[in-house]
Amino acid sequence: MAASYEEERDIQKNYWIEHSADLTVEAMMLDSRASDLDKEERPEVLSLLPPYEGKSVLELGAGIGRFTGELAQKAGELIALDFIDNVIKKNESINGHYKNVKFMCADVTSPDLKITDGSLDLIFSNWLLMYLSDKEVELLAERMVGWIKVGGYIFFRESCFHQSGDSKRKSNPTHYREPRFYSKVFQECQTRDAAGNSFELSMIGCKCIGAYVKNKKNQNQICWIWQKVSSENDRGFQRFLDNVQYKSSGILRYERVFGQGFVSTGGLETTKEFVEKMNLKPGQKVLDVGCGIGGGDFYMAEKFDVHVVGIDLSVNMISFALERAIGLSCSVEFEVADCTTKHYPDNSFDVIYSRDTILHIQDKPALFRTFFKWLKPGGKVLISDYCRSPKTPSAEFSEYIKQRGYDLHDVQAYGQMLKDAGFTDVIAEDRTDQFMQVLKRELDRVEKEKEKFISDFSKEDYDDIVGGWKSKLERCASDEQKWGLFIANKN
């Protein structure tokens, strides 16, 4: 039975009174390696924040000030809030020389906490929501949306799934939730101002903390960035992916067809074949664009001892990828990100890998120029993607392309775009015959398991998959749809 509000607050307060007797970074992070982790993790977290120079910032669960001093150096004004008195006093003793900081002992769940609506540019919290009940998270999310200005941001970071720190604890009342809980609560949060205008939160980013992946092979440290927008704002393509093409049920359906961990053509079989062509070496860094639910990334990290960064625009895909990572202990980090707006430093990756994803991107030349910058000299790109015949598409095929929002090119034109972006040794292969063989095998498997498929999903799902696969085969047989494999180098 869920604890009452008073019981929940007492449990959490007593837990933190016990763990704040020793006011050190080890006590706050509940980890014996805290000092070393902090050196990598704190700069990483701060680097993820939107610009807040001269802005009004609220830090919830400020603790002894691990982030307070850093925030104070840039913020116009900062409120540092914590509900344990001796903890916030310690913070003030360390950071009180910053005259733009107000230190406050208060409980974020208390109705007595008064913050003016529309007064903040950024709300920052690090390990706070996991110490609140589900209902408290929902109520606080609503209040936070009210507190920030339109265009303002909310950043929070939480431990998901299970404990990360190695500190021994008599009891542990922490709520280690699935990331999809936080995504759902904040996505569904809507507020109205006095004039009746409606506002909601748009997800700007969601990723696991790289320092924990690198040092602990742990993907459960996850942060979110949200921006307050008018409810009329169109979230466009991301909403289409998560509500239409890649709904949670649809992803599981695709996974049944492609194999565990995969949502692209051929599953593990084609992954093994194509990854072999990249000549991966231990310690290399790979970017997977459109990583789906992570099967290819886990394979690369485990088999070749590389570090993989998987990005996907679909929140649902990344949620599944994070869940699949539990217990694998591999060097893979995941992020909800748009590859057309994402920024990485030049020369960041040894390999960029993308499977049946770039068909969604309208400006491929711009994306390939970006890939070229992100790759290190000597780096390699490998892409498989839907393509089309050079001839004029039929009305039916044109309608299919339009309905899916695809941007398709013929295989040679696709390869030329890579050359134009600066790549050399470009290989552009028409793999349509292989595509058709794989489609037939996948279709045959689904049809043989018809009763189980319908039992696990539905008759409608079965008909969608069978009809969709047969349509792909027909389009390929009529020389309209193609499948291309592209490999290129950066000298």
From Swiss-Prot:
It catalyses: phosphoethanolamine + S-adenosyl-L-methionine = N-methylethanolamine phosphate + S-adenosyl-L-homocysteine + H(+); N-methylethanolamine phosphate + S-adenosyl-L-methionine = N,N-dimethylethanolamine phosphate + S-adenosyl-L-homocysteine + H(+); N,N-dimethylethanolamine phosphate + S-adenosyl-L-methionine = phosphocholine + S-adenosyl-L-homocysteine + H(+). GO terms for biological process: choline biosynthetic process; methylation; phosphatidylcholine biosynthetic process; pollen development; pollen tube growth; pollen tube guidance; post-embryonic root development; unidimensional cell growth. N-methylethanolamine phosphate binds at Q245, Y246, Y254, Y386, Y400, R404, G405, Y406, K472. Induction: Induced by salt stress. Induced by phosphate starvation. The modification N-acetylalanine is found at A2. Phosphocholine binds at S159, S164, G165, R169, Y176, Y254, Y386, Y400, R404, Y406, K472. One of its GO terms (cellular component) is cytoplasm. Disruption phenotype: Altered root development due to defect in primary root elongation and root epidermal cell development. Temperature-sensitive male sterility and salt hypersensitivity phenotypes. The double mutant nmt1 and nmt3 exhibit severe compromised aerial growth and reproduction, extensive sterility, drastically reduced phosphocholine concentrations, and altered lipid profiles. The triple mutant nmt1, nmt2 and nmt3 is seedling lethal. Its EC number is 2.1.1.103. InterPro entries: Methyltranfer_dom, Methyltransf_25, Phosphoethanolamine_N-MeTrfase, SAM-dependent_MTases_sf. Highly expressed in the meristem and elongation zones of the root. Expressed in differentiated root epidermal cells. Highly expressed in leaf vasculature. It is found in: Cytoplasm. Keywords: Acetylation, Cytoplasm, Lipid biosynthesis, Lipid metabolism, Methyltransferase, Phospholipid biosynthesis, Phospholipid metabolism, Repeat, S-adenosyl-L-methionine, Transferase. S-adenosyl-L-homocysteine binds at G61, R66, D82, D107, V108, N126, V263, S264, G290, D312, D338, C339, R355. Pathway: Phospholipid metabolism; phosphatidylcholine biosynthesis; phosphocholine from phosphoethanolamine: step 1/1. GO terms for molecular function: methyltransferase activity; phosphoethanolamine N-methyltransferase activity. Transmembrane segments: none annotated. Involved in phosphocholine biosynthesis. Catalyzes the N-methylation of phosphoethanolamine, phosphomonomethylethanolamine and phosphodimethylethanolamine, the three methylation steps required to convert phosphoethanolamine to phosphocholine (PC). Required for root system development and epidermal cell integrity through its role in choline and phospholipid metabolism. In association with NMT3, regulates PC homeostasis, phase transition at the shoot apex, coordinated organ development, and fertility. Belongs to the class I-like SAM-binding methyltransferase superfamily. PEAMT family. This is Phosphoethanolamine N-methyltransferase 1. It comes from Arabidopsis thaliana. The gene is NMT1.
